[in-house]
Swiss-Prot record:
Keywords recorded for this protein, A-Z: Antibiotic resistance, Transport
Phenotype of null mutants: Deletion of the gene results in increased susceptibility to different antibiotics, dyes, detergents and disinfectants.
Residue pairs linked by disulfide bridges in the UniProt entry: none
A GO BP annotation: response to antibiotic
InterPro entries, per database record: AdeT1/2, TRAP_DctP_sf
Its job: Mediates antimicrobial resistance via active efflux. Contributes to resistance to antibiotics such as chloramphenicol, erythromycin and novobiocin. May be part of a tripartite ATP-independent periplasmic (TRAP) transport system.
Keyword Thylakoid recorded: no
Superkingdom of source: Bacteria
Identification of the protein by name: Probable solute-binding protein AdeT1
Similarity section: Belongs to the bacterial solute-binding protein 7 family.
Pfam family, one: AdeT1_2
Amino acid sequence: MFDPIGKSGDAFALAKDYALEAKNWGADLSLKAYVDERVAAEDLKVGKCDGAIISGLRGRQFNKYTGSLDAVGALTNMKTAINAYKLLSSPMAAKNMVVGPYEIAGLGTIGPAYLFVNDRSINTLAKAAGKKIGVFKYDEAQPKLVQHVGGQAVSVDVTNAGAKFNNHEIDIVPAPIVAFKPFELYKGLGEKGAIVRFPLTQISADFIIRKDQFPAGFGQKSRTWVASQLNRTFGIIAKYESDIPSKYWMDIPKNEQLNYMKMMREARIQLTKAGIYDPKMMNFLKKVRCKENPSNFECALNDE
C-alpha cells in the first residue's frame, strides 16, 4: 500500500486494522508499504501483489468510474465526500466496482488537495497566469487545468514534487495536507508562501484487488468496512490540518471562490467530453452536491 511516510504512517496503521478485519472475510493479508505509489500500481498490474491501496488519480487506470471521484471541484468538502463514498460503497453500486480482473474493494480518503503557493500574492486565478505549476504526469486532467488558467505546467511525481517546490523550480503545487511534513513543504512556503484554504478536490484512496484471488463476497464486505472508517480517517486529516501553523493558511474572497467553482466546473465538463472523466460519475457527484446544497448555481444547469 502507498504511504509517503512508510510503515510508520497513519495510512499503514489503518491498513493493519484492515488486514485484521479481512481475516473475518476469509483472507490472510500480508502488507507491504510503498513510498512511491507508481511502483505499487505496477506491482499490482504484473501480479506481484494481489491488491493495492493507491490514490484515485493513480487508480483511474484500473477503474475509470471510481477514478473520476477525484475530478477537480467535484467534492470540495468532507460531508459531501463522506456521503458520496458511502453511497458508492453500498451493494447497489457494486456493479460499477468490477472492471476486468480488478475490483474496487474500498473507497477511503487521503484528504483534500490544496494549492501550495510560494507567494501569497497569488490569491486569484488571474494571478496564476504565467506561474510554473506542478502537475502529476500520469493525470491527464492536470495539464489541461493549468492551461485553462494560463499557467506553465511542470511535470512532477510523488518522489520529486516537494523538492521542486522547495527549490523554487515551481511556484505552485497541489498537494494533500498529509504531504506537508514528509515533503517538507514549509521550506517552499518560506516567509511569503501560503496554503490556499479552498480544496480543489478530495483525493480518494482506492483499495483495489485482483478479484479471483479473494473469496466470493470479499469485495462488498471490504467496501462496507472501509466506509465505516471514513469518519476516523477524516478525523486524522482534520488533526493534520489543525497542526499547520496558522500563518501558512490563506483564505480567498467569496467572489473569488465562485470564480474557482465556475472554472473547475467548466474544466470538468471539457475533461468529461475529452474522455478523461466518466460521465456517469460526474452526474452522480452533481446529484450528491445538489442534494447537499440545492441553492448552488450549478443545480439549475443540466450540462453535467
